[in-house]
C-alpha cells in the first residue's frame, strides 16, 4: 500500500515535469533536463528527473542536497555552452566529512533544449509572407507585427506563432516583451511604418535588423532618427540594402536573399552585401 502511494507521488511529479516542458517549448525558453541513469547501492535515490532553467530554477529532483546543487550548476553551464552530456558525481568523501549515512556515486545525463531563434516580421505584405514561410523551414519562431486591419492579413496572422497588432510601434513592441537577440525584418506598408518600427527596434538589443528600401528612403529615415537622438552607432546596426545581391525581383526571391543574410548573421558566416 505504501509503495503504491509513493508510486502515485512519482507519477504526479513526472506529469508536472512534462507540463513544465510543454510550457517551456510554447514560450520558447532554454532549459536542460537532468536524468539519473546510474547509481551505486549507497545512493539514497536511484531514479529521478529534474528540469533546470538557465537562471537556476528547477522542477523535479535528482536527490536534493549538495549533489542536486552541483547538478543544477552543471545544467546551467550546459545551457550556457549548448553542450550537455554524461556527468558523474561521487558523494562518498563529502558524506564522510559531514557524518552522513548516505553517500554513493551517481551518473546523470544532462540534455540541453535550446530555444528557437526568433524572427520578428514587421510587415505582413508579400515579402513578409514569403519570409515567414521560409524562416519557419529553417527553425525560426515567427512573430508578426503589423498595423493593418486584421481581416486583410488573416492568412499571415494564422501562419505566425504569435501576432502583435500595432497601433503604436514603440508602445506595442515594448509591451510585447520580445526576447533579446531576436532577428527583425522591417517591410511595412509605407516608409512611416518602417521608420516607427526601426525606432522601436533599435533599443531592443537585436541580433539583426534589416529594412527594405532604396537609398532615398533609407537616407530620409536615418535623418529623421538622427534628429530624434539616435546615434550613428545605432543606425550602423541596420542591414540596408537588405539581403544578398542575387538579382532578386519577385517577393519570393527577395525573401530568399533576406533569409540568407539573416542566417549568415545567425551562424556567423558569409558576407552580406552592405559590408
Tell me the role of every PLM-derived stretch.
Residues 1-165, 174-183, 217, 223-224, ...:
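Segments forming oxygen-rich coordination pockets for charged ligands
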Residues 64, 186-190, 210, 243, ...:
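Glycine- and other small-residue-rich loops at beta-strand/loop junctions that grip anionic moieties
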Residues 140, 206, 230:
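Short phosphate-binding/catalytic loops that engage adenosine nucleotides
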Residues 145, 183-184, 188-189, 199-224:
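ADP-ribose/adenylate-binding Rossmann-like module
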Residues 164-170, 176, 188-192:
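A general structural motif
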Residues 195-197:
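Glycine/threonine-rich flexible loop motifs
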Residues 212-275:
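Adenosine-phosphate binding glycine-rich loop
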Amino acid at each position: 500500500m505504501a509503495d503504491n502511494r509513493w508510486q502515485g507521488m512519482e507519477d504526479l511529479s513526472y506529469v508536472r515535469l512534462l507540463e513544465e516542458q510543454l510550457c517551456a517549448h510554447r514560450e520558447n525558453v532554454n532549459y536542460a533536463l537532468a536524468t539519473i541513469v546510474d547509481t551505486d547501492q549507497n545512493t539514497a535515490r536511484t531514479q529521478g528527473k529534474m528540469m533546470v532553467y538557465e537562471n537556476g530554477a528547477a522542477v523535479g529532483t535528482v536527490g536534493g542536497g549538495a549533489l542536486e546543487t552541483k547538478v543544477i550548476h552543471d545544467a546551467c553551464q550546459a545551457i550556457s555552452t549548448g553542450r550537455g552530456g554524461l556527468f558523474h558525481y561521487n558523494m562518498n568523501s563529502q558524506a564522510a566529512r559531514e557524518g552522513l549515512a548516505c553517500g554513493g556515486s551517481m551518473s546523470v545525463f544532462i540534455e540541453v533544449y535550446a530555444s528557437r531563434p526568433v524572427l520578428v516580421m514587421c510587415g505582413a505584405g508579400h515579402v513578409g509572407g514569403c519570409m515567414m514561410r521560409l524562416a519557419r523551414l529553417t527553425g525560426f519562431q515567427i512573430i508578426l507585427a503589423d498595423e493593418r486591419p486584421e481581416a486583410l492579413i488573416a492568412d499571415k496572422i494564422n501562419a505566425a506563432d504569435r501576432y502583435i497588432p500595432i497601433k503604436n510601434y514603440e508602445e506595442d513592441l515594448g509591451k510585447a516583451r520580445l526576447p533579446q537577440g531576436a532577428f527583425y525584418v522591417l517591410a511595412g506598408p509605407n516608409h512611416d511604418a518602417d521608420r516607427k518600427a526601426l525606432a522601436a527596434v533599435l533599443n531592443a538589443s537585436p541580433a539583426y535588423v534589416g529594412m527594405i528600401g532604396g537609398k532615398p528612403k533609407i537616407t530620409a529615415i536615418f535623418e529623421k532618427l538622427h534628429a530624434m537622438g539616435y546615434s550613428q552607432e545605432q543606425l550602423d546596426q541596420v542591414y540596408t540594402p537588405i539581403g544578398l545581391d542575387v538579382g532578386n525581383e519577385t517577393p519570393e526571391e527577395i525573401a530568399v536573399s533576406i533569409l540568407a543574410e539573416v542566417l549568415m548573421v545567425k551562424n556567423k558566416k558569409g558576407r552580406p552585401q552592405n559590408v
